[in-house]
């Protein structure tokens, strides 16, 4: 067979349609640039709200920490102005500080309470209006935690007419703890859910050694 005959016997190549190559008509959506997480509200406000209202400087004189050298402060703050520790206990808060906090704290934060203790607002109000006869103890929780807040867990009451009550360790029938608590509760408008878990007569250093009743809720 000749070369000419061999070429003629081969099938012809198919003719492809003339379809132009075009880019796709749709494009994938743009990938959003990463953004910082928003300051979502926590228990009583956005992260750092205690720093913004100046809470930690107000607590500084009342921090429950070891003694410092002259010129030193027991309060350790980071670059944001937040305490280095997320738990900051205080004791002996006076009337002036309590009144200042009533004006600075958000309304929601004033509703805080330590379990069945009086609300923070009731405790601060009692302290602010007692001219030194009522002091507060508690703690602050820093911005490191979701439950950033101020809590009052105890009050110290030094009213002279309340010092004659007898409170016994075993709380026997002769113990007057319930009668004492009712007097304190009614006098200062304390909205506690129950009697304090502990009532002790004390002479704290932060009260200049004056005698008073320390009432604490677990």
Positions of predicted regions on the chain:
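Acidic, proline/glycine-rich low-complexity IDRs
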Residues: 179, 183-218
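Intrinsically disordered, low-complexity regions enriched in Ser/Pro/Gly/Gln/His and often acidic
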Residues: 42, 55, 174, 199, ...
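Short, aromatic/basic amphipathic alpha-helical patches
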Residues: 168-184
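Long, contiguous N-terminal structural blocks used for assembly/anchoring
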Residues: 2-173
